């Protein structure tokens, strides 16, 4: 099957068909372009969605801690990667399919134009040959008619007796001329006819089949290219399926990582105040004044005039003594302490404890007149909320447990900063010693400002650590005292409750809080431990000497080539490493002279 033999007379049809093929190719390229735009918009919308639901975190406190939140953010990360794969699909289609189609369409147009021009030229040449043959034919036909006319004229004059001999001779010459011209045109016509037939045969059996064959091959290549683009279109999607599957697996793993028990524990860690729950309501004895007698020697408090105390006067005194919740006590009233509840007043010399009337009377009036202490954390939340004001430096606006955590975090950060400054100070001192011993390496005085700044930073950090440790000890001391107070007697419980607000809010008055000594755990502060050199430093790795080192300078350690030493301190940037022999001798060696191997758990420490 060949277009050149089967479609030898369908030049115009082939022209239209090849144009349709290129148009179809461009139409498919337009389809791919729109699909690319869809993929790009889809990826862009996914990224915007991830950006919208992944909040910007300005501090560590805003980082997600709950496993459900972490899982959601992991899902967002996987979705972001998924959006990246959609972009990969779009890029692959744009490069491998759309770009290839547009280049191939341009090449097809050029090739088709060239083949059609060759066909038109061949047809024009054949038409020119036919025109020449037709002109020679017409000329031969005309000359033949003229020769026939000349012959008829000659025969007429030759048969005419009246014609002169000159006229006959002239007619004969005219006949011979026309006959000769007719013969020449006949030969010309025969030659043109033979030439046209040859060109026509060549046109329809050689030139046109060759051109049509090229058009056929061009169209078949176009079809093959479309098939390849169809396959590439699908391959662009199939290539990212494994990565997309990993993204989906990551989402599933994120879903499996959700731990409800851990989230519940985080809620406890985040909102635990450290307060004890409110205690039981004490028994309110309204009949105690009935049995009170003036002759009772154990009740040695101030006696009331009239000898009898009514409920109104009792309520009035109770309201006057509720200074923890409203009014402030008079200066002459001593603060109430648990030890003042009991007095030792043996009338006959025997040792026994009796209740003093004023504390008991005070507590009973508190019970009868004070606002009932309903177990509610509304006041706690209101008292400790950060929205009530700016955060204080000692975190006293927080509940004890949260305050302790914040202070501990700050102490840890300050200790890390102190360690960094101490390392820098040590490195500067080493560099200063090197400069003093080798002045050509640098000026020791140039390091003095940096050393002074480092010392100031160390002093400042130590003061901050000491201050925060004092606050931490205060919090721990309060927590211990309040915990012990829960196990006291009912009377002691009443006094303790008298130091709390009606709604259970916490008061931090130094004159009202019975504080125990700070909890000492028998450990020194961290910056004290940093300067203790009683114990040898642990080895963090080992090294092998590449070159020998004499170690004449003070503080250095001589070594031989190939000798193995212990590393007890890394190079701080000054070019020296602290090493130790097996016999315990320590010193500094040049870092470039040794091959260092550090333990994995000691790197970066």
Curated annotation (Swiss-Prot):
Record field: compositional bias (Basic and acidic residues): 480-490
Segments forming domain F-BAR: 1-263
Expression (tissue specificity): Isoform 1 is expressed in brain. Isoform 2 is expressed in brain, kidney and lung. Within the brain expression is seen in cortical neurons, hippocampal pyramidal neurons, hypothalamus and piriform cortex.
Residues of the REM-1 domain: 397-474
GO molecular function: GTPase binding; lipid binding
Lineage: superkingdom: Eukaryota
Domain SH3: 538-599
Coiled coil: 66-258, 392-484
Region feature (Interaction with CDC42): 245-535
Localization of this protein: Cytoplasm; Cytoplasm, Cytoskeleton; Cytoplasm, Cell cortex; Cytoplasmic vesicle
InterPro entries given in the database record: AH/BAR_dom_sf, F_BAR, FCH_dom, FNBP1L_F-BAR, FNBP1L_SH3, HR1_rho-bd, SH3-like_dom_sf, SH3_domain
This protein's record includes keyword Cell membrane: yes
Region (Interaction with DNM1): 522-605
UniProt feature, compositional bias: Acidic residues: 527-536
GO process annotations (BP): autophagy; cell differentiation; cilium assembly; clathrin-dependent endocytosis; membrane invagination; nervous system development; plasma membrane tubulation; positive regulation of filopodium assembly
In-chain residues carrying the UniProt-annotated modification Phosphoserine: 295, 488, 501, 505
Main location: cytoplasm
Membrane topology, from the record: Peripheral membrane protein
Chain intervals for the UniProt region annotation (Interaction with DNM2 and WASL): 541-597
Residue numbers spanned by region Interaction with DAAM1, DIAPH1 and DIAPH2: 541-605
Subunit structure: Homodimerizes, the dimers can polymerize end-to-end to form filamentous structures. Interacts with GTP-bound CDC42. Interacts with DAAM1, DIAPH1, DIAPH2, DNM1, DNM2 and WASL/N-WASP. Interacts with ATG3. Interacts (via SH3 domain) with ABI1, WASF2, CDC42 and WIPF1.
Protein name: Formin-binding protein 1-like
Organism listed in the record: Rattus norvegicus (Rat)
């Amino acid at each position: 099957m060949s277009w050149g033999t089967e479609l030898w007379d369908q030049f115009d049809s082939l022209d239209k068909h090849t144009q349709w093929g290129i148009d179809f190719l461009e139409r498919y390229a337009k389809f791919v372009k729109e699909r690319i735009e869809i993929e790009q918009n889809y990826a862009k919308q996914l990224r915007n969605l991830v950006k919208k639901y992944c909040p910007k975190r300005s501090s560590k406190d805003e980082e997600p801690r709950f496993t459900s939140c972490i899982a959601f953010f992991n899902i967002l990360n996987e979705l972001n990667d998924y959006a990246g794969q959609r972009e990969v699909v779009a890029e692959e289609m744009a490069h491998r399919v759309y770009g290839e189609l547009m280049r191939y369409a341009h090449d097809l147009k050029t090739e088709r134009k060239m083949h059609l021009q060759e066909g038109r030229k061949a047809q024009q040449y054949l038409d020119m040959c036919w025109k020449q043959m037709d002109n020679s034919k017409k000329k031969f036909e005309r000359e033949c008619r003229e020769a026939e006319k000349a012959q008829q004229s000659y025969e007429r004059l030759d048969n005419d007796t009246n014609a002169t001999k000159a006229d006959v001779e002239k007619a004969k010459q005219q006949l011979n001329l026309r006959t000769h011209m007719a013969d020449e045109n006949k030969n010309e016509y025969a030659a043109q006819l033979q030439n046209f037939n040859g060109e026509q045969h060549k046109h329809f059996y050689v030139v046109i089949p060759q051109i049509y064959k090229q058009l056929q091959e061009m169209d078949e290549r176009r079809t093959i290219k479309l098939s390849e683009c169809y396959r590439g279109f699908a391959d662009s999607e199939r290539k990212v399926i494994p990565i997309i599957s990993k993204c989906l697996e990551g989402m599933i793993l994120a879903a499996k990582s959700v731990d409800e028990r851990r989230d519940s524990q985080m809620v406890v860690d985040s909102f635990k105040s450290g307060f004890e729950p409110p205690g039981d309501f004490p028994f309110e004895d309204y009949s105690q004044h009935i049995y009170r007698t003036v002759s009772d020697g154990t009740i040695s408090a101030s006696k009331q005039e009239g000898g009898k105390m009514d409920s109104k006067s009792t309520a009035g005194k109770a309201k006057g003594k509720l200074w923890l919740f409203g009014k402030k006590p008079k200066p002459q009233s001593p603060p109430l302490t648990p030890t003042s509840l009991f007095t030792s007043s043996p009338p006959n010399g025997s040792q026994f404890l009796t209740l003093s009337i004023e504390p008991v009377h005070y507590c009973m009036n508190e019970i009868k007149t004070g606002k009932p202490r309903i177990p509610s954390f509304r006041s706690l939340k209101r008292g400790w909320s950060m929205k009530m004001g700016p955060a204080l430096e000692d975190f006293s606006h927080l509940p004890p447990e949260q305050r302790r955590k914040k202070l501990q975090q700050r102490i840890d950060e300050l200790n890390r900063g102190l360690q960094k400054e101490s390392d820098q100070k040590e490195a500067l001192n080493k560099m200063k010693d090197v400069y003093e011993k080798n002045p050509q390496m640098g000026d020791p005085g140039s390091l003095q400002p940096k050393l002074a700044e480092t010392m100031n930073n160390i002093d400042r950090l130590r003061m901050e650590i000491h201050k925060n440790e004092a606050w931490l000890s205060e919090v721990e001391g309060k927590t211990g005292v309040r915990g012990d107070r829960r196990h006291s007697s009912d009377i002691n419980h009443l006094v303790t409750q008298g130091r709390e607000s009606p709604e259970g809010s916490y008061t931090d008055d130094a004159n009202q809080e019975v504080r125990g000594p700070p909890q000492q755990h028998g450990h020194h502060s961290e910056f004290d431990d940093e300067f203790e050199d009683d114990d040898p430093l642990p080895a963090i790795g080992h090294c092998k000497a590449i070159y020998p080192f004499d170690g004449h300078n003070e503080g250095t350690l001589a070594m031989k080539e190939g000798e193995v030493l212990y590393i007890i301190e890394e190079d701080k940037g000054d070019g020296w490493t602290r090493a130790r022999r097996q016999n315990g001798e320590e010193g500094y060696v040049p870092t470039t002279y040794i091959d260092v191997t550090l333990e994995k758990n000691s790197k970066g420490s």
